[in-house]
Amino acid sequence: MACQRHLLFLLLVLFAVSTQLSHGQHWSHGWYPGGKRELDMPASPEVSEEIKLCEGEECAYLRNPRKNLLKNILGRSNQKKNADVLARQLQKK
């Protein structure tokens, strides 16, 4: 009888743990945790207008913000270039 109780308790614990592990986010093809989508995929009808307008190197939406931060910290010589890019972006809007 005591052995059956231990077995029942073990099964209950395993069931509880397995249900907690299965609550993870389902990853669809091309999607990453947090709803972030891979941008290197071919264009689809779901692509927003902002992404469609961003087809050059100067697009702020497709840039990695960490890269920009690192560039700004390491070298201040690009300030004029950054100001020109910002001015062009403001003119486009």
UniProtKB/Swiss-Prot annotation:
Midbrain and hindbrain. It is found in: Secreted. Keywords: Amidation, Cleavage on pair of basic residues, Hormone, Pyrrolidone carboxylic acid, Secreted, Signal. The keyword Flavoprotein does not apply. The modification Glycine amide is found at G34. Pfam families: GnRH. GO terms for cellular component: extracellular space. It comes from the Eukaryota. One of its GO terms (molecular function) is gonadotropin-releasing hormone receptor binding. The keyword Secreted applies. The modification Pyrrolidone carboxylic acid is found at Q25. Residues 1-24 form the signal peptide. Coiled coil: none annotated. GO terms for biological process: hormone-mediated signaling pathway; reproductive process. Its main location: secreted. Stimulates the secretion of gonadotropins. Belongs to the GnRH family. This is Progonadoliberin-2. It comes from Aquarana catesbeiana. The lineage of its organism: Eukaryota, Metazoa, Chordata, Craniata, Vertebrata.
